[in-house]
Amino acid sequence: MARGCLCCVKYMMFLFNLLFWLSGCGLLGVGIWLSVSQGSFATFSPSFPSLSAANLVITLGSVVMVTGFLGCLGAIKENKCLLLSFFIVLLIILLAELILLILFFVYTEKVSENAKQDLKDGLRLYNTDNNVGLRNAWNIIQAEWQCCGVTGLSDWHEALQEKSVPDRCCQEHYTECGRNTTNVFWSQGCYEKVEEWLNDNKHLLGTIAMCVLVLQLLGMAFSMTLYQQIHRAGKKYDA
C-alpha cells in the first residue's frame, strides 16, 4: 500500500515537472527567437541595457527549465537530495517574488518616478547610431498604443532639443510629419497608456499571478510529500 502511494505521488510529480520543464523549453525557444530575429527591438532603459524582452524571456525560461529538470530527475530517481533542492529553489523563488511585490507596493511612487526619469533619459539616445533597438522600440510602442513620449510630446522637445517629435507621434503618419508643427500629435504619454492597460487588465493579471502561485505551492507540496514517502520507505527497509 505504501509503495503504491509512493508510486502515485512519484509519477504525479514527474508529470507535473515534465510540463514545467516543457514550458521552460518553450520560453527559452521564444527568447532565443526574439534575440535572433527581433534583435533590433531592444530596451527602453539606458541604465539597464541588458533588460530587453528577449533576455528576460531567456532568463525566465532557463530558470523554469532547470527547476523542472530538478523535479523530474528527483521524482524518477526517488532522490531525496534532488527533491530537497527542488523544494529550496521553489521556496527561494517564492520568497523573492513576495519581497519584490512588497517593495514595489511600499515604494510605488518612487519606483514610478525613477522609471519615468530613466525612460526620459533614454529618449536622448533616440537618434544616435548605436541605439537602433531603442528607436525601433519607441516607434512600435507609439504607433501601437497611440501615444507620444513618456508623459507627453514635450518629453521629445526636451530630449531632441528642438520642436519636433518622431513621426510615429503623428495621428496621420507620413515621412517627416513630426517636424510639421501644424500636425495633430498623440497627446497622451506612453507611461500613462501602460498604466491604463495594467488597470484595465488587473483582474486577468491577478488571476495569472494566482495560478503561478498555486503551481509553485503544488510543486513544493509534491516534492515534500514524495520526500517524506521515500524517507519513510527507507526507514522501513532498514528496519
UniProtKB/Swiss-Prot annotation:
Gene3D superfamilies: Tetraspanin. Glycans are attached at N180. Residues 1-13, 77-85, 225-239 are cytoplasmic. InterPro entries: Tetraspanin/Peripherin, Tetraspanin_animals, Tetraspanin_CS, Tetraspanin_EC2_sf. PROSITE patterns: TM4_1. It is found in: Membrane. The chain crosses the membrane at residues 14-34, 56-76, 86-106, 204-224. GO terms for cellular component: plasma membrane. Keywords: Glycoprotein, Membrane, Transmembrane, Transmembrane helix. The keyword Transmembrane applies. The keyword Nucleotidyltransferase does not apply. Residues 35-55, 107-203 are extracellular. It is a multi-pass membrane protein. PANTHER family: TETRASPANIN, TETRASPANIN-9. Belongs to the tetraspanin (TM4SF) family. This is Tetraspanin-9. It comes from Danio rerio. The lineage of its organism: Eukaryota, Metazoa, Chordata, Craniata, Vertebrata. The gene is tspan9.
